[in-house]
C-alpha cells in the first residue's frame, strides 16, 4: 500500500548504464521517470523514446514533481538537484537501494564478482529467455538480442548485475547469488583486500534457505570462503572438483569447446560462441544457475553456442586497412590479460596493436605494478592519459610513467592517439581500443575518420 503512493522517479546521472537500466524497468512498469545527465548518449535517447523526460545539465528545477530521487555513485553530494531534493524533503537514495527495491518484487539472481559480471548476467538472461521463463533483465551492457540493457519480463525471475564497487550489492536480497571471482579492485572504497573478501563472504551468505549461491571454486579466495559457508553452494570450475565442471577443453576456430559435467554426470559438449578461457568460467556460472533452476542442458548448450558478446566486450567495430578494430571495456590488469589472451586465441599469428586508456587515478595507483606486468607483454602499445571518472589526482600517478615502464608509446590526447596508431600500424595487425572511459568513443571516431579518408 505505501509503495503504491510513489508514482514519479527522478534519476541524477540517468545516462549511466546501470541507472538507465533501472529507469527503463520503472518506465515499463508504468511509473513516470525523469532524469538528468551532463550529456546526451544512446541510453538517454532510448529512455526519451520510451517516455522519460530527459534534462541535459543539473539544475534544481529539473526535479519537477518527483517523489523519489535516485543518484549514481558518480554524482557528488553538492549536486544542485540533490540539494534541492533535500530542501524539499524528497527521499534521496543511491542506485543500489533502488535496485534492491526491484529485487523485493521478484526472485532475484544477482551476479557479482570483480570481473565477468556483464557477460555472465547476459549468458544467464539468454538461457532463461530461451527456456521460456521470461525474466526481467538489468545488465551493465547492451545485450545484442534485446538491443538494450534492460527488459521487464512477465516471469518471476529478475537477473541483474550486483555492483560491489561501493558495497551497495549488500543491500540486495537475492534468491541466487553468483560470484565469478574476487580480485584487488575498488580499493579506493574498501581500503584493503581483506575488506573486499569480507564483503563477498557476506554477499554469498545472504541467500535465503530456499536459494543458493553459485561460486567459482578455481578462484583461491572463493575456495576459502566456500569452506566457511553454511549456505547451499553450487561450485563451478575447470581445475577443481567442482559440481559444475568443464573437461577436455580444446581450441576450435579460436573458441573453446569443452565437456560439461554436473555432479559427476557428463551432460555433453559445448562449443562456446565467444572467445577466451575466462568466458568458459562465465559460461559455467550461467550453466550452474540454469541447471539448478531446472533448465535442460539442450537449452543451455544452444544458448551458449549462439551467444554473442554484450556491447563493449571484445566488440568488433570495423576495419582499418584490413585490420580488425575491436573495442573492449577492460580496465583492470586481470581483465586486460583475459582480453589479450582471447585475441591471441582468435589471431595466433598476428601482432596486437593496443590503445589503452587507464581508468581512475586510484586504480592506476593501487595496481600500478600489476598494470606494468600485463601491459609490457603487448606487441605494440599506446597508452593515453588517465580517464579521471570524477576523481582528482591526489595520488601523484601518471600515464606517462605507466607508458615508460610498460615499454609503450605515450599519446596525450585523442588526436595524438590516432596519429600514433597510423604510425605504428602494419598490415595484418589486430587493433584494440581498451578501457572504461572515453576510449570507446575514440574508437568510433577513429573508424569514421579513416573511412572518410578512403
Curated annotation (Swiss-Prot):
EC number: 6.3.2.8
Enzyme category, top tier: ligase
Catalytic activity: UDP-N-acetyl-alpha-D-muramate + L-alanine + ATP = UDP-N-acetyl-alpha-D-muramoyl-L-alanine + ADP + phosphate + H(+)
GO CC, one annotated term: cytoplasm
Keywords: ATP-binding, Cell cycle, Cell division, Cell shape, Cell wall biogenesis/degradation, Cytoplasm, Ligase, Nucleotide-binding, Peptidoglycan synthesis
A Pfam family it matches: Mur_ligase_C
Cell compartments where the protein resides: Cytoplasm
NCBIfam families: murC
Name under which the protein is recorded: UDP-N-acetylmuramate--L-alanine ligase
Amino acid at each position: 500500500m505505501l509503495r503504491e503512493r510513489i508514482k514519479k522517479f527522478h534519476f541524477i546521472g540517468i545516462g549511466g548504464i546501470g541507472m538507465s537500466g533501472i529507469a527503463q524497468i520503472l518506465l515499463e512498469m508504468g511509473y513516470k521517470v525523469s532524469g538528468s545527465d551532463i550529456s546526451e548518449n544512446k541510453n538517454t535517447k532510448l529512455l526519451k523514446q520510451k517516455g522519460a523526460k530527459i534534462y541535459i545539465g543539473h539544475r534544481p528545477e529539473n526535479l519537477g514533481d518527483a517523489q523519489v530521487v535516485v543518484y549514481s555513485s558518480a554524482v557528488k553530494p553538492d549536486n544542485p538537484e540533490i540539494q534541492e531534493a533535500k530542501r524539499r524533503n524528497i527521499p534521496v537514495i543511491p542506485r543500489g537501494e533502488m535496485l534492491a527495491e526491484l529485487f523485493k518484487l521478484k526472485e532475484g539472481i544477482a551476479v557479482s564478482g570483480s570481473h565477468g559480471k556483464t557477460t555472465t548476467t547476459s549468458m544467464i538472461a539468454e538461457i532463461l529467455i530461451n527456456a521460456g521463463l521470461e525474466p526481467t533483465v538489468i545488465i551493465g551492457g547492451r545485450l545484442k538480442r534485446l538491443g538494450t540493457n534492460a527488459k521487464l519480463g512477465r516471469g518471476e525471475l529478475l537477473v541483474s548485475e550486483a555492483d560491489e564497487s561501493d558495497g551497495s550489492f549488500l543491500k540486495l536480497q537475492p534468491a541466487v547469488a553468483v560470484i565469478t571471482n574476487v580480485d584487488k579492485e575498488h580499493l579506493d572504497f574498501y581500503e584493503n583486500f581483506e575488506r573486499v573478501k569480507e564483503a563477498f563472504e557476506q554477499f554469498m551468505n545472504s541467500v535465503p534457505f530456499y536459494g543458493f549461491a553459485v561460486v567459482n571454486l578455481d578462484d583461491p579466495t572463493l575456495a576459502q570462503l566456500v569452506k566457511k559457508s553454511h549456505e547451499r553452494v553450487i561450485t563451478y570450475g575447470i581445475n577443481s572438483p567442482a559440481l559444475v565442471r568443464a573437461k577436455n577443453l580444446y581450441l576450435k576456430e579460436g573458441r573453446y569447446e569443452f565437456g560439461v559435467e554436473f555432479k559427476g554426470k557428463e551432460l555433453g559438449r559445448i562449443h562456446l560462441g565467444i572467445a577466451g578461457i575466462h568466458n568458459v568460467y562465465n559460461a559455467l556460472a550461467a550453466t550452474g544457475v540454469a541447471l539448478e533452476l531446472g533448465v535442460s542442458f539442450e537449452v543451455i548448450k544452444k544458448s551458449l553456442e549462439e551467444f554473442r558478446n554484450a556491447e563493449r566486450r571484445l566488440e568488433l567495430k570495423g576495419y582499418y586497412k584490413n585490420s580488425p578494430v575491436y573495442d573492449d571495456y577492460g580496465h583492470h590488469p586481470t581483465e586486460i590479460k583475459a582480453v589479450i589472451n582471447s585475441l591471441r586465441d582468435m589471431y595466433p599469428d598476428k601482432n596486437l596493436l593496443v590503445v589503452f586508456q587507464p581508468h581512475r587515478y586510484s586504480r592506476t595507483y593501487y595496481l600500478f605494478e600489476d598494470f606494468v606486468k600485463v601491459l609490457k607483454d603487448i606487441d605494440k602499445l599506446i597508452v593515453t592519459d588517465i580517464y579521471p571518472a570524477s576523481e582528482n589526482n591526489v595520488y601523484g600517478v601518471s600515464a606517462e610513467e605507466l607508458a615508460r615502464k610498460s615499454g609503450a608509446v605515450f599519446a596525450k590526447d585523442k588526436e595524438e592517439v590516432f596519429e600514433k596508431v597510423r604510425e605504428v600500424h602494419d598490415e595484418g595487425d589486430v587493433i584494440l581500443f581498451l578501457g572504461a572511459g572515453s576510449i570507446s568513443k575514440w574508437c568510433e571516431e577513429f573508424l569514421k575518420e579513416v573511412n572518410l579518408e578512403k
